[in-house]
Amino acid sequence: MSIPSILRKETLKKKDKNIDLQENNINDLVVSASRVIAPLWPISTFAAHHPWMGLEKQSFEQVANWLKEARNVDIYPSASMIHSAKAKGEIEESFLQIALSRWLDSQSFHMPRETAERFCQEALKLERLPSSLLSSPELNKLAEEINYVNTGSMKDSSMQPISSLIENQNGDNLSDILNYHIIKWCKLYLDDAGTSWAMPNREKGFYRAWQHLITFDPALSKTERKVLKDWPEDALIALTKALSELGISESNMQAYLEGHLLSLPGWAGMIRWRSQQSIEEQELLIEYLAVRLSMELAIVKPYLPLKNQKAEKKVSIVPLIASWIYWGDISIEKWLQMSATEQSELLAFAYRFDENTRKKLWLEAWEQTHAEQLREKIASKQRATNDKKRVVAQLAFCIDVRSEPFRRHLEKLGPFETFGIAGFFGLPIATTELGSNDSHPSLPVILKPKHQIKELTDENECKSYEQRKMVGSSVRYTFKTMKQNVLTSMLLPEVSGPLLGLQMVTRSFVPRRVGGFIRNLRKNMLQKPDTTFSLNHVHDTNCEIPIGFTKEEKVNYVRQALKMVGLTEGFAPLVVMCGHSSQSTNNPYAAALECGACGGAAGGFNARVFATLCNLPEVREALSAEGIKIPDDTIFAAAEHKTTVDELEWIYVPELSEIAQEAFDCIEAIMPNVSQHANRERLMQLPHFKTKIKNPSKEAHRFAEDWSEIRPEWGLARNASFIIGQRELTQECDLEGRAFLHNYDWKQDESGDILANIIAGPGTVAQWINLQYYASTVAPHYYGSGNKATQTVTAGLGVMQGNASDLLPGLPWQSVMQSDRETYHSPLRLLIVIQAPTKYIERLLNNNFTFREKVQNGWVRLASVDPEGRWKNW
């Protein structure tokens, strides 16, 4: 029953003495230790990230137990969440009993099964043991009398930083003091917001810049500065020396580094992300640890050596005995009458059926209830695949869960067919918009762009547009410069006060009107001319990636996307590629609402590029030769789904054929109705909307324009499943905006490559999004980002609470919570449902080790629906 660190490097030999390590050994240790944190993208390019992406070789249960032990972080839903879900009918008691029975079958014990079951049933009520019982003299005396019971295998073996074990004379924990210093230095080094006073020697790297300044830091004592005065100039040597002087043995080094990375997972995550972006900063994580451990040594050195530093903490048997008294109805008198063997058996069983195990069973029951409800919903609405109505237009939306209600209402109100596809449309591009010199990756962050696409227009039009744009940029730049300058910042309130005061009043009391006025003013001033794209391949040695596509690449990307969604025949007169974006004001998390997968890149640019490619005669001719015949009167257009207001904005409408024009007019006529229905459904889910909304679209625009609105939309909250299959599988099903939907036709995927690509790409993205929402819900203090209203945007990187907290890695409280006590997001691991024959799923699992590992270790759930409609849980 020991709980060793599951992340300790297996190849290290256990030694009790301090040793000097080779540089490559330290490098390997840092790489291995870095698995416990996830890269953290800057908030301006916010990307959903799976907090435990480096730990998937361990099971979800193992990681949950390790985090509970190492950091006291609980990643299972709390008792209040579970009770609330049960009250709302989200957990069926029968599934809990099945989970309990399965757990008992896996255990070895010698007591009567009914005794074990009775104990477990009471414990599963998730009631806390009474404090009066835990502190009772009789119980503690009993624990002392039976302390000979063998609990040697029940030990806490986590490796905590030494600073966390020490308090100074003021009662302050030294790890808190260390964190304060590290946060300060991280902010100084990582600040890319263009501050007037940059960190000196920043170009030499984090460690060297810190070393040049640390001996002048007035926040350190003279003794602490003296320790660091002649410290090594090389980060790797400094890290090795700090580990040695702290007395960390080789066998404990990785666990010790993990402990430090987990102390500030946000800042460490940002450091890790930066280290992956350029060769110049690839050693940044080593430098961070060198700074952190060097400062730890300086702070704790007066307290070294610690007495009993290596003493192992034994598990207290008091709560174990109390649990049998309270839940097992075994009195103290009965305990005294038992043999040592019987006592040991009961204690061991109570130890195994701990709080994490109980919550694990509840989570499994919650997830199984959701799977069964989804199965019943799909089964009740299944239609024959040949029962298709005639459609005048086909619209392809992002798999994003916010597309599901919009698609459902669109199909219900008109003769339309919709598809689900990853919102970058399979185009691995970096985009450069008109008037900009900077390119932005416009694809999921797990991929790298292979082509650069520039927006082009007539030279004179471009100059005129750039001049208009420069006016606005100059005003913003002047304001920012004045704000950051020591002298002009005192004058700024006098100069800008009246204007900003007027803005504050109008924005607060008439947000929709003012927001609309500002948006229209900006649109008129910055009216973008008609543009084209650099679609044709150009060899430019100054560009890291090629500009445009070759003919073969154009055909390949179009073919790949059309086959991925099964659209290779039966084209409607009008096919619309719909990217998505959001609309909010004064929102640090605006990028997260745009697209959590693509680093805040809206999908309109990609949609327009893809539609343009589909209209090229050369592409159509090549596809026709391969059997994909697009009719001459079928036109591809592009639009953008505004998720905050549920509107469709046209961004590319070429010259339409007569029949395509009719389809376009049909969409235009029905769209206001679709928006009203979709907005009503979405707004009713927000807090404080208990009555009927008279004008949903008007109310949605108010939410989007109100700069005091902390929850303009729910984002991807309540996401729970990823359904891969034909639209007929879920058509007419009200999936409540909880499902990622990706079209897939197994009959067109004989090799299984399309399914494998969906799982590797969109499937991974959906899992990351799901687990970020999960983590931000179950452990908001560690993996979330607190209350939006009290956040501080820091150094252009992310948010903090106050000015000296960790860089908060997850989603704000308002993204997952309905109220202070009620969650909105249901913390369930993603259920992937694939519509395909069983042999397709077996082949997928056999060929894709990474995905099989995720399923086996409990990071995702998997189910399938075969051609006859039979559901199977894997």
From Swiss-Prot:
InterPro entries: DabA. Its cofactor is Zn(2+). Zn(2+) binds at C398, D400, H580, C595. It is found in: Cell membrane. It comes from the Bacteria. It is a peripheral membrane protein. GO terms for cellular component: plasma membrane. GO terms for molecular function: zinc ion binding. Keywords: Cell membrane, Membrane, Metal-binding, Transport, Zinc. Forms a complex with DabB. Part of an energy-coupled inorganic carbon pump. Belongs to the inorganic carbon transporter (TC 9.A.2) DabA family. This is Probable inorganic carbon transporter subunit DabA. The gene is dabA.
